[in-house]
Amino acid sequence: METFCFRVSFWVALLGCVISDNPESHSTNLSTHVDDFTTFRGTEFSLVVTTHRPTNLALPSNGSMHNYCPQQTKITSAFKYINTVISCTIFIVGMVGNATLLRIIYQNKCMRNGPNALIASLALGDLIYVVIDLPINVFKLLAGRWPFENHDFGVFLCKLFPFLQKSSVGITVLNLCALSVDRYRAVASWSRVQGIGIPLVTAIEIVSIWILSFILAIPEAIGFVMVPFEYKGEEHKTCMLNATSKFMEFYQDVKDWWLFGFYFCMPLVCTAIFYTLMTCEMLNRRNGSLRIALSEHLKQRREVAKTVFCLVVIFALCWFPLHLSRILKKTVYDEMDKNRCELLSFLLLMDYIGINLATMNSCINPIALYFVSKKFKNCFQSCLCCCCYQSKSLMTSVPMNGTSIQWKNHEQNNHNTERSSHKDSIN
């Protein structure tokens, strides 16, 4: 895990060096209403960086142009290629990792329980983002324009792209909250032994999570349109949030705070509350004979709780830099300040690093689980090698989070062993 974190830090630092090697070349003129010129998985660039030509554009809602920064904005070829390599790596790792995660859970009936279903839902949301949104992001960076900008399909993509971004991050956030609640329920109801299968309550939770995520993303599909504008005598079109009603104007004004509060703070607060309650519950169980009876049972569930906590921490680390840059832009930036260009250069650097970290979150969960659970690591390797179920004498069912542990030895079919394995199943 330490090696993995070091490699991620190295690439992020390298990306930062490429961006910051010439700060003047990356300064841009930013207005409050250009927030959504470029979109990245639920949180928008406020910086005009989609064009490969030197750009010095500010496009307010009233169509007038602000005073430009002295320096022009441009994206170096080195950054383009490094960012493209990072995006392609995330695409491959995210698609293989999340698809493998879904395959393991689908093919192994013993893993079809509540928490595994929630993490499968999490993986499916990440997979949708990786397959649909990442290719569009790479195209925008390399081509310097919106795909099919002069066709109806381009308008459809302009609606679909931010909608899926918000839906994906909503699915991630709500699933993490549901996992935290589930871990508390599992510890609080220590005597409940769950067999194979997904509980009805969990199935309802998953359906509700997806429906709510889609509903919360509807304003994105409504507000984003292809906006034509003229720059240096040339006609351009870009996909951006264009408020045309009082509701959309209100949504645009509070959007950054809404994203920070609901899509970032809420899962952290939810995890803190339920993990505190879970800790108190575990401490209350550590008494006399009850402690002995529950020792192994709670040990398994404690390990699951650590895994879920790890996923929440990774989510926080991936998304915090981007939310921080958005809040700084909202609170510190003044578009009428003549000295704003230095701040814009700093915000641009934070946005680039934050966006790449946030995008990594869509592929990092399977990797994290790979390092957290040795049993999942073995099953992951076996699944990729297409030999997960070829053992002759032993059928091992191992979950992706190292929780649903069931060993059935065909030569030693012991009733007590099977009963114990069901008790160790994640609830």
Swiss-Prot record:
Glycoprotein keyword on record: yes
Topology in the lipid bilayer: Multi-pass membrane protein
Extracellular topological segments: 21-80, 133-159, 230-256, 329-347
Record: glycosylation sites: 29, 62
Pfam families, per database record: 7tm_1
GO MF annotation terms: endothelin receptor activity
Residue ranges crossing the lipid bilayer per the database entry: 81-102, 113-132, 160-181, 206-229, 257-278, 307-328, 348-372
UniProt-listed InterPro entries: Endthln_rcpt, ETA_rcpt, GPCR_endothelin_rcpt, GPCR_Rhodpsn, GPCR_Rhodpsn_7TM
Residues with the Phosphoserine modification: 425
GO cellular component entries: plasma membrane
Keyword annotations: Cell membrane, Disulfide bond, G-protein coupled receptor, Glycoprotein, Membrane, Phosphoprotein, Receptor, Signal, Transducer, Transmembrane, Transmembrane helix
Organism superkingdom: Eukaryota
Chief localisation class: membrane
Protein location: Cell membrane
Cytoplasmic topological segments: 103-112, 182-205, 279-306, 373-427
Gene3D superfamilies: Rhodopsin 7-helix transmembrane proteins
Signal peptide span: 1-20
GO BP annotations, alphabetical order: developmental pigmentation; endothelin receptor signaling pathway; enteric nervous system development; regulation of blood pressure; vasoconstriction
Disulfide bonding pattern of the chain: 158-239
Function: Receptor for endothelin-1. Mediates its action by association with G proteins that activate a phosphatidylinositol-calcium second messenger system. The rank order of binding affinities for ET-A is: ET1 > ET2 >> ET3.
Family indicated by similarity: Belongs to the G-protein coupled receptor 1 family. Endothelin receptor subfamily. EDNRA sub-subfamily.
Subunit description: Interacts with HDAC7 and KAT5.
Protein name according to UniProt: Endothelin-1 receptor
Native species: Sus scrofa
